[in-house]
């Protein structure tokens, strides 16, 4: 986590992109969509499939697009802290 991030105030959605066998999928485009499926942000997953977004409490869809396939997962953080989610692509 970057220095200066106050996890008592910040809502962080973090996780990994994995394939059907649970192996990391690096280089995937990971998008954060709000509750009405509107695009909010995009990052590229690290070589180990890791990604991170700073968001507000609410319902979010995390969508991963990769050469190994695509996948979605919904996460609904209710407050500050780290909220971990894995996105499985197929």
UniProtKB/Swiss-Prot annotation:
Q: Which Pfam families match?
A: DUF1416
What name does this protein carry?
A: Uncharacterized protein MSMEG_5790/MSMEI_5637
Specify the domain of life of the species encoding this protein: Bacteria
Sorted alphabetically, the keyword list is: Isopeptide bond, Ubl conjugation
**UniProt lineage:** Bacteria, Bacillati, Actinomycetota, Actinomycetes, Mycobacteriales
Swiss-Prot/TrEMBL puts the cross-link Isoglutamyl lysine isopeptide (Lys-Gln) (interchain with Q-Cter in protein Pup) at: 88
